[in-house]
């Protein structure tokens, strides 16, 4: 099972707009410059804040449609969309199974014989809530409801199942989760219905988890339509130090359509395998799959009757990875989220066919290997995927500021690129008046280096008029751009991309000097 995102619907504003249901709600995102001026009028019009850091408000769709032209005319409107519904999809191949069968996956992921740590990095399950009266969660320590949980049997079915795989305790009943001592946090996205999940609640849940501090955020949900606001919430969480783990989807035998949030950058995407350690037919294939974990005929806690049952779907392989990631992070607290991302997937055990592939990514989750895997290079400026991520007034998330400034005119860093998850790194630099600036990238891989002028909107312009210089020679090693002096100082942008067609991941060093 995986929560399914219903097709996106833009809030039409023209004279031929389709009929908007009378009870519909909309999400309005203000521009950064308009936040102070427009917040109070929106609240007075009946809006509620969804994510203050993202400047997102929820209000009746009819009101949003009435206010939108004025907001747009005042350059105050960044995004407007209907608050869409999400719903739990049908369970794939569900069948009753003895509780002992729940343990088959434990040896597969390398935790037999290992002692899990005590409570540490939290796992936030953004889902349909947890049945806190279920035997697995009744009086369980370190179980936190971040908002009210819809009581069973109306709510909590999907979320209870997911959370039980993260951390069902050793309590003498039922199953044992991958990390039985985990700190489990739950954000119930299905309040008021129990089956329908709102986009606004997903955003609230991701934001609440990120605001609580670095941890693992489990998203066993998805859909075929890209949603800018959910993507921004994920980017913000990643910038604040959290690891977002998402289900690849259950359409492997239905043509493998795009699936979000699984296909977003900076999301650890999980497919599902069966008891034979082969990728399950339903598990969605895509270049964005990072690793797989058991997800077929896995016994979980169920809120329907406070019991347990066998379930199948990437919804259930995903929390196994989330719990494992929290275990590894607790045992290796010196890692940041960018390093943990790499550790979890690069330590995976390859499954046929050999090498990285669309079905299994890097392979099967291996907790023992992840605990021992060498720490990779940190990638501290992420997410920095384009100009709008690093501009100070963009409302995006790079918290480290520009590489160079008027006062600091030299810099050096080490970072990492990924052809699928992180193909572009952008940095803001200061070009002082009447001085040349040398930008140098060094890598064992073939990276391309470009420097863009202050008017750049996006580095995807290619060879646009804002390009100040480029070194895109098709070879590994040293790349350099020297920006010629100009009469006045100005801001510019450095772009580093992975060139050629070979290799998925590359580390590089970048220096800026006069």
Positions of PLM-derived features:
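Structural recognition of the beta-strand scaffold that forms the well-ordered cores
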Residues: 27, 81, 122-125, 176-177, ...
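Autoinhibitory propeptides
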Residues: 18, 36, 40-102
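C-terminal subdomain of the subtilisin-like protease fold in secreted/lumenal serine endopeptidases
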Residues: 205-220, 228-229, 233, 240-242, ...
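Hydrolase catalytic cores
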Residues: 163-166, 185-190, 215, 247, ...
């Amino acid at each position: 099972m995986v929560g399914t995102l219903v097709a996106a619907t833009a809030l039409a504003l023209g004279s031929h707009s389709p009929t908007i249901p009378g009870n519909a709600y909309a999400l309005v995102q203000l521009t950064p410059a308009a936040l102070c001026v427009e917040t109070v009028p929106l609240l007075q019009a009946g809006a509620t804040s969804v994510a203050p850091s993202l400047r997102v408000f929820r209000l009746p769709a009819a009101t949003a449609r009435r206010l939108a032209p004025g907001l747009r005319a005042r350059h105050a409107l960044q995004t407007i969309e209907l608050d869409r519904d999400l719903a739990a999809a049908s369970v794939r191949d569900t069948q009753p199974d003895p509780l002992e069968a729940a343990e088959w996956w434990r040896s597969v992921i390398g935790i037999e014989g290992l002692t899990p740590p005590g409570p540490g990095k939290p796992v936030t399950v953004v889902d349909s809530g947890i049945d806190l009266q279920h035997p697995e969660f009744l009086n369980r320590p370190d179980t936190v409801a971040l908002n009210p949980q819809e009581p069973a049997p109306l709510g909590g079915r999907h979320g209870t199942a997911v959370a039980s795989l993260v951390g069902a305790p050793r309590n003498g009943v039922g199953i044992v989760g991958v990390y039985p001592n985990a700190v489990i946090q739950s954000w119930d996205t299905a309040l008021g219905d129990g089956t329908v999940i709102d986009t606004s609640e997903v955003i609230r849940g991701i934001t609440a988890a990120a605001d609580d501090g670095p941890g693992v955020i489990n998203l066993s949900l998805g859909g075929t339509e890209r949603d800018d606001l959910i993507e921004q919430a994920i980017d913000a969480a990643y910038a604040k130090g959290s690891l977002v783990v998402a289900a690849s989807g259950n359409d492997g035998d239905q043509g493998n359509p795009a699936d979000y949030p699984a296909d977003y950058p900076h999301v650890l995407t999980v497919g599902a395998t069966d008891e034979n350690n082969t990728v399950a037919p339903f598990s969605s294939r895509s270049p964005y799959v990072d690793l797989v974990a058991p997800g077929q005929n896995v016994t979980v806690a169920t809120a329907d009757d406070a019991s347990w049952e066998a379930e199948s779907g990437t919804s259930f392989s995903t929390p196994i990875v989330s719990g494992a990631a929290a275990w590894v992070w607790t045992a290796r607290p010196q890692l940041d989220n960018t390093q943990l991302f790499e550790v979890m997937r690069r330590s995976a055990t390859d499954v046929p066919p050999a090498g990285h592939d669309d079905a299994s990514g890097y392979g099967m989750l291996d907790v023992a290997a992840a605990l021992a895997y060498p720490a990779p290079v940190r990638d501290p400026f992420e997410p920095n995927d384009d100009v709008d991520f690093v501009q100070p007034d963009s409302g995006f998330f790079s918290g480290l500021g520009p590489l160079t400034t008027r006062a600091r005119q030299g810099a050096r860093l080490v970072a990492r690129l990924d052809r699928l998850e992180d193909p572009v790194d952008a940095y803001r630099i200061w070009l002082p008046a009447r001085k040349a600036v040398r930008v140098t990238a060094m890598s064992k891989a073939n990276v391309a280096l470009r420097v863009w002028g202050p008017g750049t909107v996006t580095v995807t312009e290619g060879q646009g008029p804002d390009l100040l210089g480029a070194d895109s020679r098709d070879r590994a090693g040293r790349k350099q751009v020297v920006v010629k002096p100009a009469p006045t100082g100005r801001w510019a942008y450095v772009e580093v991309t992975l060139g050629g067609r070979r290799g998925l991941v590359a580390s590089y060093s970048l220096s800026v000097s006069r």
